[in-house]
Amino acid sequence: MSQVELPLIDYAAITPILVILGAACLGVLVEAFLPRHQRWSAQVGLSLLALVAAGVALALHARQGGTGVTTLSDSLAIDAPTLFLWGTLLALGLGAILLIADRSVESGGAFVAESNDTGPAGAGEMTRATAAVAGMRTEVFPLALFALGGMMVFCAANDLLTMFIALEVLSLPLYLMCGLAKRRRLLSQEAAVKYFLLGAFASAFFLYGLALLYGYAGSVKLSAIAAATAGTDRSDTLLFAGLGLLVVGLLFKASVGPFHTWTPDVYQGAPTAVTGFMAACTKVAAFGGILRVLQVAFEASSWEWRGVLYAVAIVSMAIGVVLGLTQSDIKRMIAYSSVAHAGFLLVGSIALTERGLAGTMFYLLAYGFTTIAIFGVISLVRTSDGEATHLSDWAGLAKRSPVVAWVFTFLLLALAGIPMTSGFVGKFVVFEAALADGMAPLVVVALVASAVAAFFYLRVIVLMHFSEPAEDGPTVSVPGAFTTAAITLGVVVTLLLGVLPSLALDWANLGGFVS
């Protein structure tokens, strides 16, 4: 009788994942056994401690030169891009947890305490008094850690089956988190249902593509698929169909147009802190998976699929900037901005060079911190119903709160790609890599899209600084320590990466993928 061979596990290499997922499991126990009044402090402390501990473990492993390692029967690849993306996710996760934890802006926190706590006539709203007594729904913290752990596995997945499992681990908590908003409950729950239904549909595409590629290559490992595509004795039908379905699932998660239809509604309906978490961290994980799949498994057949993704990038940029111009809700505007930025990121992803890889990863880092800070600022501008997201509410904001208005102005200019911000450097390195790889027409389209996108950022800036505030306009809440820390972190990193980009670019250039 043959014995089952146990997989070799490099525990040092996967310690950051184990810390995050272990803390998520402890968070579930906290919810089960601690009294309600003790849960918030325990969950916040546990989450922040886990993120810092995972970051320290990652730094120690990177310092010891622990790159180019495959573990768990080659299902995970711990290489230089993995370490960069893990570091990015942990840093962005820290900023998002700070936003989620803040209870000073919204009495009792931004998350509903009980699913059946509603306001008068079943309006789906909680009163401030009810919210303050009930407290904050603290299971959002382990849900965020589970999602973050899934994102880390997704970035490192070296076979399609591991990638699919990680996709579900990161997606399911996000579906729940989207429906936990205290204010505008029905809108939040509608967003959660839409995200779940469309996400399940996209996961089915990914899984079907996985099955076809397994039939094509006889394996789900990326290296085996790469070896199969290098040959000429197999059916191209399975390859093209499998790759197409697989990429649809990946592009959906990255909010790339035309697979972006969930993005505006979910960004608008989800709690603002959760929107920031999704907008920053999910995009990092999704493009981490896209980069690995394209560069490891399908580089040999790139001439067959690059034209399709070339067109998809153009469509995504066009949808993002054109529909972004028409929006009157600031969260929906940022959602369409995200679709446009996904197109810019796709430009670097299909370059298939080390410069394209490094540029795309730098862009993800820069965009993530700017986005976290933007949603932190949005959470401060409030009416009696919650955040003031209609653009008219932001008129004259500089006269009511000049500091908040100028911070938001700086962040919008970073998204527009103005020099001395991280957004400018991110676009520059991505477009330079695309030019070097012979994609000049695509870069021209991207530059035009960037110019058009700058218009709707400038529209908000002009509205804040050169319009008169309404007498019954929204108030600007005094941010608590957590929100202040998250916004400050985002602003400082956005400025530093614009002035000293080598701080991150040198790390991003340390090496490519291993398989």
Swiss-Prot record:
Membrane topology: Multi-pass membrane protein
Keyword Membrane part of the UniProt annotation: yes
Keywords assigned: Cell membrane, Membrane, NAD, Quinone, Translocase, Transmembrane, Transmembrane helix, Transport
GO terms for MF: NADH dehydrogenase (ubiquinone) activity; NADH:ubiquinone reductase (non-electrogenic) activity; quinone binding
Predominant place of localization: membrane
EC identifiers of the protein: 7.1.1.-
Disulfide bonds: none
An example Gene Ontology CC term for this record: plasma membrane
Pfam family, one: Proton_antipo_M
Family assignment from sequence similarity: Belongs to the complex I subunit 2 family.
PANTHER family referenced in this protein's UniProt entry, alphabetically: NADH DEHYDROGENASE
HAMAP family recorded: NDH1_NuoN_1
Job description of the protein: NDH-1 shuttles electrons from NADH, via FMN and iron-sulfur (Fe-S) centers, to quinones in the respiratory chain. The immediate electron acceptor for the enzyme in this species is believed to be a menaquinone. Couples the redox reaction to proton translocation (for every two electrons transferred, four hydrogen ions are translocated across the cytoplasmic membrane), and thus conserves the redox energy in a proton gradient.
Official protein name in the record: NADH-quinone oxidoreductase subunit N
Record organism: Saccharopolyspora erythraea (strain ATCC 11635 / DSM 40517 / JCM 4748 / NBRC 13426 / NCIMB 8594 / NRRL 2338)
